[in-house]
Amino acid sequence: MPSRRFWIWFSMPQKMALIFDHILPVPLAEQAAQNSVWRSRLEVHPGNHFAIIASSGRGKSTLVNIAYGIRHDYSGSYKIDGRAASGLSAIDWSLLRQSTYACVFQDLKLFPQLSALDNLKLKCDLGSSFSIQQATAMAERLGLAPYLDKPCGQLSMGQQQRLAVVRALCQPFQYLFLDEPTSHLDRANADLVIELVMEQAAAQHAAVMITGLDQDHRLPHSFQLLCV
């Protein structure tokens, strides 16, 4: 059970910094480059934009999963507003993910048996301040209107990626993590996704951390490239 101090901390609207200090995942200890994110200090503040562009197997998803609190098999220090991430309980992480962290996972983590619309409704019903009308409006911008009543498992991978992006945006956040969110999209749809992401992030003055295999989705110039 988290202390009352943690409950108050996660409930209060504030701008917190993330500090990755010489983080090194155990599986990558042998191959991490000296000039990479893994062997340096990285500070991320609301409003920052970072892009991690690298080939497969370099640890892009690992970094996202560490940041989001899914993986803990690393050396070094990861601090959230000065507090060690390793000391947070499951409930503490849950509170963070309700109001501070949003994420698009590489494997999307959608519910294939539910319709696309029900996937969005589920997110909106879980204490989110976003209405289903707002969610469907974003889905329509990404060309998903004709597919909202279809089971998610019947959608193409590109359609599922766009749905996962909309779902991630249906909550308050200060940090948005996107793990290869446009890998199955053509240029036009990728541009629509990035446009919506940046618009919503700007509205909340949020940081954006995005991973990709290449720079083909033409990220805005505000993004700083990082090496893993």
Model-derived regions, located:
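Q-loop/switch helix immediately C-terminal to the Walker
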Residues: 107, 113-126
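Conserved ABC ATPase signature
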Residues: 151-159
